[in-house]
């Protein structure tokens, strides 16, 4: 079967992403083994609601006659006016600025290191931007293994810690950084089993195991201003907000106005603590708000009863649903109040939503810029930005990395990174704090590092030399 634009990523060993079938995900709570042995703490799973079946009373049925079973279906509420379903404007004057694929060479990079994680795909790689002490530390997810490294000045890596799940069939798809109440770094990861592992890197022990999703978890993000809050995007079509400090499931986003297929990506707003983005296989990008339910977020910190008794709330309607792509949307990020989103259409879009104040349910999408990415037509290929969102790096299926200058119009391609030895699809990139180092993880189990080339400045001649 040839590759198509709607391929499933592989979660099985030695299976190509375009040929893999979606695995079944058993709901078992497995422990994970750290470099120092520790026990896992599992929060109880959220019970699935069942549709009740009621029989008519004996007074309404004749004696000896078979009684009918009446199935009561829940009523579906209408979409509220506050939810805007927007599409892009088309026509003269609505054209987006498209970047050129000719590199400007504003910054030049060279390959400085290659590290082999294993034989299974490395699906995730991310720097720790939550604490200035750890800006040069990054984490990776490869099969059932999580690893943390430090970027050294000579272009090399220093392995700090490594964690191995007891279930060797686990395949971690996402990894993120969080913090506990004392500021210790927490490593948060999840994958095919749907169980979220929270590891305290300072104590080298399991901090929490969060159970609640009914399918694999595709992405986890922590809130920049409150890193003990995380959101998780799942195959079960829902997004969940967790407090990793207490292990409480606070909010569940999904339902009538939620995603209609697997959720692939999420991202917290950098300055608005209430809003976040989500995207998925239903070709949409949605903006959600937690403002009306923030009291439950605050309550989750002081909750002393069992986590299963916490009054978890369900949020069914997003603020906005953007139908801007015609295929799977696997990555999205905020750029201020603008949105960057990527589908399997060989480009990244920068857009904003325009709604009417008198009628928030009406409006349109204004596509501002397009960042072309050739040979990027398979899903689960995620881009990343530096700390200040000045530049963006995205890999493709041929092993090339495109580095774009984000905050210019039209977009400027800073560099195109390639190496003859990189022949596998790049699943995710990681850009360092200042953009001087770019990392990429590949389908064949490798991590590649590019570092900026320093060009010595020519000395200014003195008056005597003149």
Swiss-Prot record:
Family annotation (Pfam families): WD40
Tissue: Expressed specifically in seed endosperm.
Biased composition, class Low complexity, residue ranges: 31-49
Renumbered ranges of WD repeats: 167-209, 212-252, 258-298, 324-361, 374-414, 421-460
Compositional bias per record (Basic residues), positions renumbered to this chain: 1-10
GO BP terms, alphabetized: cell differentiation; embryo development ending in seed dormancy; endosperm development; flower development; heterochromatin formation; negative regulation of transcription by RNA polymerase II; seed development
Source superkingdom: Eukaryota
Region entry Disordered, spans: 1-71
SMART domains, alphabetized: WD40
Gene Ontology cellular-component annotations: ESC/E(Z) complex; PcG protein complex
Disulfide bonds: none
Keywords: Chromatin regulator, Developmental protein, Differentiation, Repeat, Transcription, Transcription regulation, WD repeat
Assembly with partners or alone: Interacts with EZ1 and CLF. Component of the polycomb repressive complex 2 (PRC2), which methylates 'Lys-27' residues of histone H3 (H3K27me3), leading to transcriptional repression of the affected target gene.
Function: Polycomb group (PcG) protein. PcG proteins act by forming multiprotein complexes, which are required to maintain the transcriptionally repressive state of homeotic genes throughout development. PcG proteins are not required to initiate repression, but to maintain it during later stages of development. They act via the methylation of histones, rendering chromatin heritably changed in its expressibility. Together with EZ1 and CLF forms a complex that is involved in gene transcriptional repression by trimethylation on histone H3 'Lys-27' (H3K27me3) of target genes.
Family, as annotated: Belongs to the WD repeat ESC family.
Note: The FIE1 locus is imprinted. Maternal inherited gene is expressed in the ovule (the egg and the central cell), while the paternal inherited gene is silenced in the pollen. After fertilization, only the maternal inherited allele is expressed. The gain-of-function epi-allele (Epi-df) plants exhibit dwarf phenotype, defect in flower development and very poor seed set. Plants silencing FIE1 have delayed embryo development, reduced seed set, and reduced grain length, width and weight.
Protein name as annotated: Polycomb group protein FIE1
Protein source organism: Oryza sativa subsp. japonica
Organism lineage string: Eukaryota, Viridiplantae, Streptophyta, Embryophyta, Tracheophyta
Gene name, Swiss-Prot/TrEMBL: FIE1
């Amino acid at each position: 079967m040839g590759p198509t634009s709607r391929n499933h990523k592989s979660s099985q060993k030695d299976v190509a992403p375009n040929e893999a079938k979606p695995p079944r995900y058993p709901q078992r709570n497995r422990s994970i083994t750290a470099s120092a042995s520790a026990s896992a703490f599992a929060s109880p799973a959220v019970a699935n609601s069942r549709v009740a079946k009621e029989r008519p009373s004996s007074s309404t049925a004749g004696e000896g006659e078979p009684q009918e079973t009446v199935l009561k279906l829940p009523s579906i509420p209408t979409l509220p006016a506050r939810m805007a379903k927007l599409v892009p404007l088309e026509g003269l004057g609505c054209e987006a600025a498209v970047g050129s694929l000719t590199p400007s060479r504003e910054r030049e990079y060279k390959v400085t290191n290659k590290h082999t994680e294993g034989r299974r795909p490395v699906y995730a790689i991310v720097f720790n931007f939550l604490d200035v002490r750890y800006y040069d530390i990054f984490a990776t997810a490869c099969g059932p293994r999580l690893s943390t490294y430090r970027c050294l000045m000579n272009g090399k890596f220093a392995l700090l810690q490594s964690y191995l799940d007891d279930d060797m069939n686990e395949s971690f798809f996402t990894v993120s950084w969080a913090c506990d109440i004392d500021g210790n770094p927490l490593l948060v990861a999840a994958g095919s089993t749907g169980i979220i592992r929270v590891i305290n890197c300072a104590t080298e022990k399991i901090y929490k195991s969060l159970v609640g999703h009914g399918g694999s978890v595709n992405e986890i993000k922590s809130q920049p201003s409150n890193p003990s809050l995380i959101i998780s995007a799942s195959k079960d079509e829902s997004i969940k907000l967790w407090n990793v400090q207490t292990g409480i499931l606070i909010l569940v986003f999904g339902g009538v106005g939620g995603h209609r297929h697997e959720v692939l990506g999420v991202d917290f707003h950098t300055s608005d603590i209430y809003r976040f983005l989500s995207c998925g296989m239903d070709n949409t990008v949605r903006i959600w708000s937690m403002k009306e339910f923030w009291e439950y977020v605050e309550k989750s910190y002081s909750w002393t009863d069992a986590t299963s008794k916490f009054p978890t709330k369900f949020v069914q309607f997003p603020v906005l649903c953007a139908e801007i792509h015609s295929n799977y949307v696997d990555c999205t990020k905020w750029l201020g109040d603008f949105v960057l989103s990527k589908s399997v259409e060989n480009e990244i879009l920068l857009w904003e939503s325009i709604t009417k104040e008198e009628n928030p349910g009406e409006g349109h999408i204004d596509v501002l810029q397009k960042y072309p990415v050739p040979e990027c037509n398979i899903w689960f290929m995620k881009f990343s930005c530096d700390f200040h969102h000045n530049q963006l790096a995205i890999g493709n299926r041929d092993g090339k990395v495109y580095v774009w200058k984000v905050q210019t119009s039209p977009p400027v391609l800073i560099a195109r990174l390639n190496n003859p030895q990189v022949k596998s699809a790049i699943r995710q990139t990681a850009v360092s704090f200042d953009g001087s180092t770019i990392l990429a993880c590949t389908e064949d189990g490798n991590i590649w590092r590019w570092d900026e080339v320093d060009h010595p400045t020519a000395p200014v001649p003195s008056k005597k030399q003149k």
